[in-house]
């Protein structure tokens, strides 16, 4: 069946992918012919996710490496999977429930809600998998993993228990990012900074005990104070006046002469009456604001640091919903007598409380002033609500105890991070690491394997010494009720059975009948109190210890998604079981990831794998940059510049999208993506398709069979292209081995479009009518086969379709052996001759174009001087040169005729007479005018780029665009100058 005129990507892509899957082409070990393994882990996209350009870029690079290694015979595994994405998934499902008019999460209860989440996951959670298939991702989908799969859950819980028992996980009170909408702690990655128009309120805090001081109010030209006033207050500034209710100190810089003498004194907090100290800390900058800073350790990360250094209390004055928590808050009321106005703020939303505090400050005279202020406010990236730094009880990993192996592994080269600058980011984060908050107040996720029990033996309670509680003692225990208020005890275990044994050990040391109690699981502390009290009361009536129960309840929180995804490499390979896959593929070879999650994910995987199995998770980390729009701007919905990879695939085909991303994947440099580039690379695929159709029309595919070695060739053109094929194979392999994806793509582009389609196809046309026809058919078939093979990792669909429709194939292209030939195929004589021919044709074409010779006009050429090698090359290829350079013929002369353009090539020179062909004077004037305008434009660009204010204040993408335009202008100026110089030779 003859080839179609064009490649129909829309029809072929689904058909080809289905064929690959049915053939098991992507399964681990498929096509393996050597002992080496290659394993790469997909960064698991969120189960809620849809394919965006970052995914498309990242997975294209992974697929290239996977297909390349698979074709080279490596035992290859590209491990796919999805992340359960705790907060994102819970948000989606809650929104769906609300849209359908169903009860909310809290009304449903945990178990029923989680059933709904699993239903949603089964119905809608596979969207991104199908989208990755459209991109051509050759993952082993039979091993598709999910971070909530039972085996993965076992791994996560085991690691938590192990790290807890080693003392690396603990429960503590620290400041976290708190999302009031979802009522949970969130990671830094889930926080986005939003610039807002706001106010800076200046507040006056009165010095305690009637103290006063002299405050400078006028200064000379050198900044020295010239006048003072007596003050009995300090002025502080804040964008969040409602937090003043939790202030516990005022910080001043010890070098600030205005306030240094006040250090150690106190101010009285308005509304609250709390006396708070003035402390010395370098965080207070004398040059900013008033120089005195209100410190609220429980509601500001910087203030928390000051509080830790200076010993200030931390008082939380908000609930998880960001409403004011005052009246029943013992921390707030301790040591002070809040005013009625302060207590009236209890229960108000933080923003309403802000208005009331400002109004009260104005009424009572402690509002010093208001300044308009544009500043950044952190928001939850999903809730779009301003987050609150919140002091809460959370679970933490004591990262300081486990980071050193992760640092050492990169420093010693066990794991390499590329580009090198990203290794610095990695080190910076690890060397300045804080304890990692791993608990989230959500329901969807890995529930923390910790159970709590009541402290049923209060410290102040004693029995009569007979190790048995009688009726009176049990009644006293109930009446005392101390276990209602004491902090609960807790144990950590893999499951309830394991934790029951630990609680039973605790109970064994208690008097009878408590030591006979059965451990049962209940939902909450409140239920535990009720069940225990009822059990003790019942025992007093029936004295039957078999009915005595000790209720425990599981921590309701779940683990941070990054905790489970931090175990992705070993968890997907079957750990903690000793699976064959774990033994064979771990540690993995390379991780390809974006720079934005180096510290959130990459560093944590390094930390976790080394802490758990004492091995690095991967040998190389390749960090790619961002995909931006064609002007260098970050893609965002608000700017309307988002490119949807699926829409691009629909319009241009997956191969064009993949090749574009690959060709632009310069290490460490952001991509500037445009549809024009994608269209251009679609044309590249069309060029290869047309070359194969040309081959078909000339009988190349008749009886053609796949051959690893090139055919024996005698024709110079055939010997030359065989050598070029050997060269490009070496270039591609060297580039991919060094993760220079752009170099591989650009080498293939230059070879396929330039050497094969532009030159070899043209050179071969006359040979099909000579005795070299059979050899040329064999050579062209072999060369085009190699084009398909070498391009397949980047453009899998069109190459697989071409492979199936050309010649006789024993197996699919996806499993065809990668070539091993190289520069040994180069024939020096053929290479020298054809390079000379191409150089002459290109020089003539360039000269014609520069001086605007009409494209279809054939010109005579005068041979001025030529060595013996050149004469032989010209004699053998004269017809080709005349046809491809659009020449009438060659003559010889000792000197160039008047009005001729000279051309130099290796071993000689030629002249092209132009008198009467073009108006040389008019052409020079046109070029000069164009050059003058270009110089003017470039001068403007240089002026902007030489202006420090422009470079410092303009958006990065605007500066980059100016630099790009200047570079393009320099290139254009060089071309115009060269053309003018050529014309100046003539007249």
Curated annotation (Swiss-Prot):
SUPFAM superfamilies attached to this UniProt entry:
Anticodon-binding domain of a subclass of class I aminoacyl-tRNA synthetases, Nucleotidylyl transferase, tRNA-binding arm, ValRS/IleRS/LeuRS editing domain
Map motif 'HIGH' region onto the chain.
45-55
Domain of life according to the entry: Bacteria
**Cross-referenced InterPro entries:** aa-tRNA-synth_I_CS, aa-tRNA-synth_Ia, Anticodon_Ia_Val, M/V/L/I-tRNA-synth_anticd-bd, Rossmann-like_a/b/a_fold, tRNA-bd_arm, tRNAsynth_Ia_anticodon-bd, Val-tRNA_synth_C_sf
Query: Does Acetylation show up as a keyword for this record?
Result: no
Q: Position of motif 'KMSKS' region?
A: 634-638
Its Enzyme Commission number(s) read 6.1.1.9
Keyword flag Glycosyltransferase = no
Q: Which residues form a coiled coil?
A: 917-987
Tell me, what's a Pfam family for it?
Anticodon_1
Single annotated GO MF: valine-tRNA ligase activity
Q: Which GO terms describe its biological process?
A: valyl-tRNA aminoacylation
What cellular component GO annotations does this protein have? cytosol
The transmembrane residues are: none
Q: Alphabetically list the UniProt keywords.
A: Aminoacyl-tRNA synthetase, ATP-binding, Coiled coil, Cytoplasm, Ligase, Nucleotide-binding, Protein biosynthesis
Q: Where in the cell is it found?
A: Cytoplasm
* Catalytic activity from the UniProt record: tRNA(Val) + L-valine + ATP = L-valyl-tRNA(Val) + AMP + diphosphate
Per the entry, what this protein does is: Catalyzes the attachment of valine to tRNA(Val). As ValRS can inadvertently accommodate and process structurally similar amino acids such as threonine, to avoid such errors, it has a 'posttransfer' editing activity that hydrolyzes mischarged Thr-tRNA(Val) in a tRNA-dependent manner.
Q: What family is this protein classified in?
A: Belongs to the class-I aminoacyl-tRNA synthetase family. ValS type 1 subfamily.
Q: What PANTHER family does this protein map onto?
A: VALINE--TRNA LIGASE, CHLOROPLASTIC_MITOCHONDRIAL 2 (PTHR11946:SF93), VALYL-TRNA SYNTHETASES (PTHR11946)
Per the record, the domain comment is: ValRS has two distinct active sites: one for aminoacylation and one for editing. The misactivated threonine is translocated from the active site to the editing site. The C-terminal coiled-coil domain is crucial for aminoacylation activity.
State the HAMAP family in the record.
Answer: Val_tRNA_synth_type1
- Please state what the protein is called: Valine--tRNA ligase
Q: Which species does this protein come from?
A: Cereibacter sphaeroides (strain KD131 / KCTC 12085) (Rhodobacter sphaeroides)
């Amino acid at each position: 069946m003859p080839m179609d005129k064009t490649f129909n990507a829309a029809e072929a892509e689904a058909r080809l992918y289905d064929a690959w899957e049915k053939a098991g082409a992507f399964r681990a070990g498929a096509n393996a012919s050597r002992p080496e393994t290659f394993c790469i882990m997909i960064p698991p996209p969120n189960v809620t996710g849809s394919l965006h350009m970052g995914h498309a870029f990242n997975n294209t690079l992974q697929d290239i490496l996977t297909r390349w290694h698979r074709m080279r015979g490596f035992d290859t595994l590209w491990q796919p999977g999805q992340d359960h994405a705790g907060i994102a998934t819970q948000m989606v499902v809650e929104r769906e429930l609300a849209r359908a008019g169903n009860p909310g999460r809290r009304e449903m209860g945990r178990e029923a809600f989680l059933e709904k989440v699993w239903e949603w996951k089964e119905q809608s959670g596979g969207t991104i998998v199908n989208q990755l298939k459209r991109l051509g991702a050759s993952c082993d989908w039979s091993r598709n993993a999910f971070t909530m799969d039972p085996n993965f859950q076992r791994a996560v819980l085991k690691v938590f228990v192990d790290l807890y028992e080693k003392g690396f996980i603990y429960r503590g009170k620290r400041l976290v990012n708190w999302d009031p909408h979802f009522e949970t702690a969130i990671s830094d990655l889930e926080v986005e900074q939003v610039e807002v128009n706001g106010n800076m309120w200046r507040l006056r805090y009165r010095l305690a005990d009637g103290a006063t001081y002299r405050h400078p109010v006028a200064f000379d030209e050198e900044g020295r104070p010239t006048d003072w006033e007596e003050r009995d207050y300090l002025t502080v500034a804040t964008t969040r006046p409602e937090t003043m209710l939790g202030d516990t100190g005022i910080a001043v810089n010890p070098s600030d002469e205005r306030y240094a003498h006040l250090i150690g004194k106190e101010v009285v907090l308005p509304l609250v009456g709390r006396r708070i100290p003035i402390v010395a800390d370098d965080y207070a900058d004398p040059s900013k604001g008033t120089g005195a800073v209100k410190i609220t350790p429980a509601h500001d990360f910087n203030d928390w640091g000051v509080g830790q250094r200076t010993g200030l209390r931390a008082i939380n004055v908000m609930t998880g919903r960001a409403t004011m928590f005052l009246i029943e808050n013992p921390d707030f009321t301790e040591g002070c007598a809040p005013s009625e106005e302060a207590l009236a703020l209890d229960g108000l939303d933080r923003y309403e409380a802000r208005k009331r505090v400002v109004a009260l400050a104005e009424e009572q005279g402690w509002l010093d002033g208001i300044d308009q202020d544009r500043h950044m406010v952190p928001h939850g990236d999903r809730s779009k609500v301003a987050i609150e730094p919140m002091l809460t009880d959370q679970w933490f990993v004591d990262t300081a105890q486990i980071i050193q192996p992760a640092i050492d592994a990169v420093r010693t080269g066990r794991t390499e991070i590329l580009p090198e600058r990203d290794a610095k980011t990695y080190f910076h984060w690890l060397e300045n690491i804080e304890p990692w908050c791993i608990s989230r107040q959500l329901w969807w996720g890995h529930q923390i394997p910790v159970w709590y029990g009541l402290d049923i033996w209060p410290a102040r309670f004693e029995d009569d010494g007979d190790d048995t509680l009688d009726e009176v003692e049990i009644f006293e225990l109930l009446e005392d009720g101390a276990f209602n208020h004491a902090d609960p005890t807790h144990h950590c275990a893999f499951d309830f059975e394991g934790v029951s044994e630990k609680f039973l050990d605790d109970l064994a040391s208690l008097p009878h009948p408590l030591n006979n109690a059965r451990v049962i699981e209940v939902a909450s502390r409140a239920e535990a109190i009720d069940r225990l009290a009822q059990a003790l009361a019942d025992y007093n009536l029936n004295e039957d210890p078999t009915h005595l129960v000790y209720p425990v309840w599981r921590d309701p929180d779940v683990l941070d998604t990054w905790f489970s995804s931090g175990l992705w490499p070993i968890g997907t390979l079957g750990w903690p079981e000793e699976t064959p896959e774990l033994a064979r593929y771990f540690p993995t070879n390379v991780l390809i990831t974006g720079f934005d999650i180096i510290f959130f994910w990459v560093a944590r995987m390094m930390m976790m794998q080394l802490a758990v199995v004492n091995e690095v998770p991967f040998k190389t980390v390749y960090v790619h940059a961002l995909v931006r729009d064609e002007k260098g701007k970050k893609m965002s919905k608000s700017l309307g510049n988002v490119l949807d990879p699926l829409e691009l695939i629909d319009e241009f085909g997956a191969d064009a999208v993949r090749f574009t991303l690959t060709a632009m994947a310069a290490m460490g440099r952001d991509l500037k993506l445009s549809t024009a580039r994608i269209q251009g690379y679609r044309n590249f695929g069309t060029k290869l398709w047309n070359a194969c159709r040309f081959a078909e029309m000339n009988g190349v595919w008749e009886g053609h069979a796949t051959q690893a070695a090139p055919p024996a060739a005698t024709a110079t053109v055939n010997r030359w292209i065989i050598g070029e094929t050997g060269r490009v194979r070496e270039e591609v392999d060297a580039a991919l081995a060094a993760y220079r994806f752009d170099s591989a793509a650009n080498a293939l582009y230059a070879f396929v479009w330039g050497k094969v389609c532009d030159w070899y196809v043209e050179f071969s046309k006359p040979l099909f009518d000579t005795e070299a026809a059979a050899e040329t058919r064999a050579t062209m078939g072999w060369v085009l086969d190699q084009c398909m093979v070498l391009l397949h990792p980047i453009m899998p669909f069109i190459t697989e379709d071409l492979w199936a429709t050309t010649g006789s194939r024993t197996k699919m292209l996806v499993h065809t052996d990668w070539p091993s030939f190289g520069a040994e195929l180069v024939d020096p004589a053929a290479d020298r001759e054809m390079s000379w021919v191409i150089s002459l044709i290109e020089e003539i074409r360039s000269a014609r174009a520069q001086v605007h010779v009409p494209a279809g006009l054939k010109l005579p050429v005068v041979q001025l001087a030529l060595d013996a090698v050149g004469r032989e090359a010209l004699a053998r290829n004269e017809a080709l040169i005349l046809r491809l350079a659009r020449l009438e013929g060659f003559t010889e002369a000792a000197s160039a005729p008047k009005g001729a353009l000279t051309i130099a090539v290796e071993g000689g020179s030629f002249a092209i007479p132009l008198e009467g062909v073009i108006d040389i004077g008019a052409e020079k004037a046109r070029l000069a005018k164009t050059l003058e305008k270009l110089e003017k434009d470039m001068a403007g660009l240089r002026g902007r780029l030489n202006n420090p204010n422009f470079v410092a204040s303009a958006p990065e993408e605007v500066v980059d665009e100016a630099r790009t335009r200047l570079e393009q202008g320099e290139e254009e100026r060089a071309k115009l100058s060269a053309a003018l110089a050529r014309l100046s030779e003539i007249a």
